Swiss-Prot record:
The gene is ndhC. NDH shuttles electrons from NAD(P)H:plastoquinone, via FMN and iron-sulfur (Fe-S) centers, to quinones in the photosynthetic chain and possibly in a chloroplast respiratory chain. The immediate electron acceptor for the enzyme in this species is believed to be plastoquinone. Couples the redox reaction to proton translocation, and thus conserves the redox energy in a proton gradient. NDH is composed of at least 16 different subunits, 5 of which are encoded in the nucleus. Belongs to the complex I subunit 3 family. One of its GO terms (biological process) is photosynthesis, light reaction. One of its GO terms (molecular function) is NADH dehydrogenase (ubiquinone) activity. The keyword NAD applies. Keywords: Chloroplast, Membrane, NAD, NADP, Plastid, Plastoquinone, Quinone, Thylakoid, Translocase, Transmembrane, Transmembrane helix, Transport. It comes from the Eukaryota. It is a multi-pass membrane protein. Pfam families: Oxidored_q4. Coiled coil: none annotated. This is NAD(P)H-quinone oxidoreductase subunit 3, chloroplastic. It comes from Huperzia lucidula (Shining clubmoss). It is found in: Plastid, Chloroplast thylakoid membrane. The lineage of its organism: Eukaryota, Viridiplantae, Streptophyta, Embryophyta, Tracheophyta.
Length: 120
């Protein structure tokens, strides 16, 4: 009788998934047409002639708001599994989750008092 280990399909899938990028990348680079010229260095704006430079500077405040969003989003994602298992985990998990929520809140209040949210 032929017995298959529990994880053989996983290892086979992992092997095939890890072989796809190194095989597909050279195939696409050799088969794709390569056009050289000054048009390659211009920005594409839906067939319309580009106006101005493609490289513009963003204010640093944009990155501050974006980083606050990413941190709060990561915090929400990390709290979701805890919320799903709230009844089974008990008081120690509640204490850890409250500490995990308190740290970004304290950091946000500190940044707000220092004026990090002011757009000036």
């Amino acid at each position: 009788m032929f017995l298959i280990s529990k994880y053989n399909y996983f290892w086979l899938f992992l092997l095939l998934a890890s072989l796809i990028p190194p095989v597909a990348s050279p195939i696409s680079s050799y088969s794709a047409p390569v056009g050289k010229g000054p048009e390659k260095f211009t920005s594409y704006e839906s067939g319309i002639e580009p106006i101005g430079d493609a490289w513009i500077q963003f204010q640093i405040r944009y990155y501050m708001f974006a980083s606050v969003f990413v941190i709060s989003d990561a915090e929400t994602v990390s709290l979701y599994p805890w919320a799903m298992c709230f009844n089974e985990l008990g008081v120690p998990a509640s204490a850890e989750a409250s500490i995990s929520v308190t740290i970004p809140i304290v950091g946000s209040v500190y940044a707000w008092r220092r004026g990090a949210s002011e757009w000036s």
